[in-house]
UniProtKB/Swiss-Prot annotation:
BP-aspect Gene Ontology terms: response to bacterium; response to calcium ion
Topology class, membrane: Multi-pass membrane protein
The protein, known as: Probable cyclic nucleotide-gated ion channel 10
Organism classification: Eukaryota, Viridiplantae, Streptophyta, Embryophyta, Tracheophyta
Highest rank taxon of the organism: Eukaryota
Places the protein is found: Cell membrane
Subunit structure: Homotetramer or heterotetramer.
Residue intervals on the Extracellular side: 103-116, 192-204, 265-366
Recorded GO CC terms: plasma membrane
Organism: Arabidopsis thaliana (Mouse-ear cress)
Length: 711
């Protein structure tokens, strides 16, 4: 048989089963270790593609397709989420370099924090490793040809050369600019080898290198975020996680602006020192940096660069620090305590970003004004995005509750409009409340109906199979038949005191109880003096009148009439099998050739139990009646024999005394009265010794119709 070209991509090892390749359970989610294991495995295992070409070409094709990763594979999708998180962390690590310059207040010079240099460089290198892995993945990840997306998912391109050309022409340049270790080079290589003031060079180089790399790193996050949402539909699994994700972006922006505020504050103080040094005779610029050996004092800088608020400056010759006055007056630029600097600057950024920069009093310095404008615009955009996205995520957690409130309000208005009695209203409210508690507003049938058939079958097996096997009637069935039954079952709910079916109504479905208790009662067609009730619990079933009707190929279109009334004693959860579905499944019953199923049905059927009990009781009453009649006959025969013997004695004696004649007359009268009483007792037996009218024997379900019976 010839097959068309198959575009499916599978990681397949001929020596192992498919389930062992992925190593994922049905409910398991890949962890970080699992992702790295799958990454390693993905580069070792070639892809398996169906082909119709000659074996030599197949081997060549297998070699060229080696190490190609399926973009729809779960481990790659999880890696994209991890890399997206790593990109956010990278944006948070880069501003740490801005805290390296420190002002030495004692010597009035600029120095560097060597410990922070090493720590920030190591963290930046660790995050860059994620970028390297991502670039390698991009050279090994297949893509869907745009021209093939007219129908379906499109054709997967697995050629390594085509993949490389596509990546080189798209995001490779951005990824390359993002991964360049410019801050590490500045801190660990450039600074130790220059003869100029190290603090000044470090401050300037770090500012430009990090800002230059920030742009491609931010640009790379947007297509990555789009790819994650396109393949998996979501970034976070829960609404609260989504709200936290958007809040973290807002906090990241606060951290970035706080770090920039710190660095520019140091720059403004350094600028003030330079201007003061130019005006002071004998001042050398290089002595403004602590790494230079010097024996001079810079105490004049204290009076030349006072830290005054912009509103307190009356002399135009005084240096205006603008919005950076707070950082200088608080001494945060002079502190060697990193966490003190970090949290103070973070709080400044968060406060002004939330206030949209309204309280910032700037100087006439253009860079400071641009910085304040960027805070205002960024705060406006980020705050709008934060509120909008958090509202969207948080509303998703309450949308079901709102639907429930609207439904309850509509139900109350409808009940009031129709003037329903209070007892019916209570039953409706109780049903809606119980249904909400069980389903949380999710329409399960609609959700399952939109899924593929095989997936729907697996879900139904997961939901119903274990519960069905608790029902003895299903416990002895094979897996194929259970699959057919599971696919047609639908969950139903019954509130307390509600009627499932009434005696004399058509039976439209068979019910299998999973939780709760019911009572099944019958009056044997309304016959006076007859009543039978049986309690049903979990694993019991009712509506068995439908089974003989469904098993009969010649049955009419009219549903059978129920012989029992079934009422819920508590809240009941059950699975229902409708008459049409049972009719379609019944053909598989007839293929079982099993007497065991027939005996099991009889044993657990309420109708068969009732009929069996009535039959046994009737047989017992017949036995008691026959035993009583036999004892009465024996007593009558004994009395007759006594009378006969007395008559013989009377005829043999020719002469008798008056006393003997009186005794004979008394004995004769006693025997006559005893026989009369025996006959009267037989005709007036109590009802428990009489044979009542038996219930109609249930219809025998033909499990082997049109088939030979097993010996």
């Amino acid at each position: 048989m010839a097959f068309s070209h198959d575009n499916r991509v599978r990681f397949k090892d001929e020596g192992k089963p498919l389930s062992s390749e992925y190593g994922y359970g049905r409910k398991a989610r890949p962890s970080l270790d699992r992702v790295f294991k799958n990454v390693k495995w993905g580069f070792k295992k070639p892809l398996s593609f169906p082909s119709h070409k000659d074996p030599d070409h197949k081997e060549t094709s297998s070699v060229t397709r080696k190490n190609i990763i399926n973009p729809q594979d779960s481990f790659l999708q999880n890696w994209n989420k991890i890399f997206l998180f790593a990109c956010v962390v990278a944006l948070a690590i880069d501003p740490l370099f801005f805290y390296i310059p420190i002002v030495d207040s004692a010597r009035h010079c600029l120095t560097l924090d060597s410990k922070l240099e090493i720590a920030a460089s190591l963290l930046r290198t660790l995050i860059d490793a994620f970028y390297i892995i991502h670039i390698v993945f991009q050279f090994r990840t297949a893509y869907i040809a745009p021209s093939s997306r007219v129908f379906g998912r499109g054709e997967l391109v697995d050629d390594a050369k085509a993949i490389a050309l596509k990546y080189l022409s798209s995001y490779f340049i951005i990824d390359l600019l993002s991964i360049l270790p410019l801050p590490q080079i500045v801190v660990l290589a450039v600074i130790p080898s220059v003869n100029q003031p190290v603090s000044l060079l470090t401050k300037d180089y770090l500012k430009f290198s990090i800002i230059a790399q920030y742009v491609p790193r931010i640009l790379r996050m947007y297509p990555l975020y789009t790819e994650v949402t396109r393949t998996s539909g979501i970034v976070t699994e829960t609404a609260w996680a989504g709200a936290a994700w958007n809040l973290s972006l807002y906090m990241l922006a606060s951290h970035v602006f706080g770090a920039l505020w710190y660095l520019i504050s140091v720059e403004r103080e350094d600028r003030c020192w330079q201007e003061a040094c130019e005006k002071t005779k004998g001042c050398n610029m290089k002595f403004l940096y602590c790494e230079n050996d010097r024996n001079v004092s810079n105490n004049f800088l204290t009076t030349s660069c006072p830290f005054l608020d912009p509103g307190d400056i009356t002399n135009s010759t005084i240096f205006n620090f603008g919005i950076f006055t707070d950082a200088l007056k608080s001494g945060v630029v002079e502190s060697h305590d990193f966490w003190k600097k970090f949290f103070y600057c973070f709080w400044w950024g968060l406060r002004n970003l939330s206030a949209l920069g309204q309280n910032l009093q700037t100087s006439k310095f253009v860079g400071e004004i641009i910085f304040a404008i960027s805070i205002c615009i960024s705060g406006l955009v980020l705050f709008a995005l934060l509120i909008g996205n958090m509202q969207k995520y948080l509303e998703s957690t309450t949308v079901r509750e709102e639907e429930m409130r609207v439904r309850k309000r509509d139900a109350e208005q409808w009940m009031s409009h129709r003037m329903l009695p209070e007892d019916l209203r209570k039953r409706i409210r109780r049903y809606e409340q119980y249904r909400w508690q069980e389903t949380r507003g999710v329409e399960e049938e609609t959700l399952l109906r939109n899924l593929p058939k095989d997936l729907r079958r697996d879900i139904k097996r997961h939901l119903c199979l274990d519960l069905l096997k608790k029902v003895p009637l299903f416990e002895i069935m094979d897996e194929q038949l259970l699959d057919a039954v599971c696919d047609r079952l639908r969950p139903v709910l019954y509130t307390e005191n509600s009627y499932v079916i009434r005696e004399g109504d058509p039976v439209g479905e068979m019910l299998f109880v999973m939780r709760g208790r019911l009572v099944s009662a019958t009056t044997n067609g309304g016959r006076s003096g007859f009543f039978n009730a049986v309690n049903l619990k979990a694993s019991d079933f009712c509506g068995e009148d439908l089974l003989p009707w469904a098993l009969d190929p010649q049955s009419s279109s009219h549903f059978p009439i129920s012989t029992r009334t079934v009422q819920a004693l508590t809240e009941v959860e059950a699975f229902a099998l409708t008459a049409e579905d049972l009719k379609s499944v019944a053909s598989q019953f007839r293929r079982l050739h099993s007497k065991q199923l027939q005996h099991t049905f009889r044993f657990y059927s309420v109708q068969w139990r009732t009929w069996s009990v009535s039959f046994i009781q009737a047989a017992w009453r017949r036995y008691c009646r026959r035993k009583l009649a036999k004892s009465l006959r024996d007593e009558e025969d004994r009395l007759r024999e006594a009378l006969a013997s007395q008559d013989k004695e009377h005829n043999a004696a020719t002469v008798s005394s008056s006393l003997s004649l009186g005794g004979a007359l008394y004995a004769s009268r006693f025997a006559s009265n005893a026989l009369h009483n025996l006959r009267h007792n037989i005709s007036n037996l109590p009802p428990r010794y009489t044979l009542p009218l038996l219930p109609q024997k249930p219809t025998e379900p033909d499990f082997t119709a049109n088939h030979t019976t097993d010996p």
